[in-house]
């Protein structure tokens, strides 16, 4: 997992390189940035949200202030007010800015963040944290770090509406905590969409109450192929799945970090895990087995059976209830005739 996160972060950094101010290490680099003289020290500074900021923005600001207080060893009290002071760290609603845009201004008197909606405030916070020492991402006090922000004027907004990452948990299962860490890395880099690949031939990872065998049987494969030696298996059962409560928890966690989760239920191919649990959904009746290898399996959902469509309606209905995303991904690829 650590290697995956480091690779993800390194790849994003490399893709964002350019002829920018080497003193400013914000990823992705802002659309407009002016550097000034001097710095502003953030230790023991009051934090103010104007009263027009929404609840999610205020929660994000409170979280930022708490993390800041932890690593600096100081205090950063948060208040909500109709008028924000000229000094300290302030968050001001500016409806002239786009939904995901923000302005971040730092001078000797304080830090002012302006945005119109939650995403803009969130991305401003990410940029602000990247202007601070790396210890800001820690959980222990770092009093010897230089807790100062360079004086800058930033105006930024994303170029692309969809900025996503894909996570396949069917072939390799990730715990809830690992998925959350993945989301954290996405949020740091202002990515806003997680494509969560929850089912495949190698395992079914989401609880469907109407079809309990999907996880009781379909979440576990007997063994996994060793690298590309197709005839050699490790002999170790492998599995795991997420309960619906865990799914809700991840979806909320992601939403609080500006990330929408799009679930993928791959169909009509890539369905060996489901066929193993419910063989009557296949064209041959089986026997089927959760796949322990990679590639494209010949066995798929049978479109000539009414039960297949009842199954899909039941599964997708529960999935829609769990994910507020506008979209559900249904795969549709690599389906042998």
Question: Which residues are covered by each model-predicted region?
Answer:
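Positively charged n-region of N-terminal signal peptides that target proteins for export
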Residues: 1-4, 261
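Hydrophobic h-region of N-terminal signal peptides that target proteins for export
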Residues: 6-17
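Intrinsic disorder/low-complexity segments
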Residues: 10-11, 82, 87, 241
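Short acidic (Asp/Glu) and glycine-rich catalytic loops that position anionic groups and cofactors
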Residues: 15, 43-44, 291-296
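Acidic, contiguous N-terminal accessory segments
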Residues: 17-161
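Feature activates predominantly on carbohydrate-active enzymes
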Residues: 97-309, 313-329
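N-terminal leader/propeptide and maturation segments of large enzyme subunits in energy/redox metabolism
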Residues: 333-336
């Amino acid at each position: 997992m650590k290697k995956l996160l480091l690779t993800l972060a390194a790849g994003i950094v490399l893709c964002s390189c350019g002829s920018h101010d080497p003193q400013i290490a914000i990823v992705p680099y802002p659309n407009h940035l002016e550097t000034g003289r001097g710095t502003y020290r953030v230790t023991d500074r009051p934090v103010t949200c104007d009263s027009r900021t929404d609840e999610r923005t205020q929660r994000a600001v409170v979280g930022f202030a708490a993390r800041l207080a932890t690593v600096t060893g100081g205090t950063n009290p948060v208040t909500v007010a109709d008028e924000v002071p000229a000094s300290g760290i302030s968050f001001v609603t500016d409806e002239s800015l786009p939904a995901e845009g923000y302005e971040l201004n730092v001078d000797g008197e304080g830090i002012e963040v302006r945005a119109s909606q939650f995403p803009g405030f969130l991305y401003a916070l990410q940029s602000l944290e990247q202007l601070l020492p790396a210890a800001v991402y820690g959980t222990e006090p770092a009093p010897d770090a230089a807790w100062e922000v360079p004086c800058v004027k930033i105006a930024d907004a994303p170029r692309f509406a969809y900025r996503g990452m894909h996570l396949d948990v069917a072939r390799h299962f990730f715990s809830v905590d690992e998925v959350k860490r993945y989301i954290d890395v996405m949020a740091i880099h202002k990515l806003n969409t997680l494509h969560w690949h929850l089912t495949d031939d190698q395992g079914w990872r989401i609880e469907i109450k109407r079809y309990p065998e999907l996880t009781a049987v379909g979440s576990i494969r007997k063994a996994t192929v060793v690298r590309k030696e197709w005839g050699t298996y490790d002999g170790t059962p492998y599995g795991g799945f997420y309960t619906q409560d865990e799914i809700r928890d991840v979806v909320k966690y992601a939403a609080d970090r500006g990330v929408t989760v799009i679930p993928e239920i791959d169909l009509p191919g890539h369905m060996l895990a489901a066929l193993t649990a419910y063989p009557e959904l296949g064209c041959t009746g089986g026997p089927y087995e959760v796949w322990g290898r990679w590639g494209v399996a010949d066995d798929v959902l049978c479109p000539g059976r009414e039960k297949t469509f009842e199954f899909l309606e039941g599964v997708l209905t529960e999935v829609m209830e769990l994910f507020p995303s506008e979209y559900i991904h249904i795969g549709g690829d690599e389906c042998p005739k």
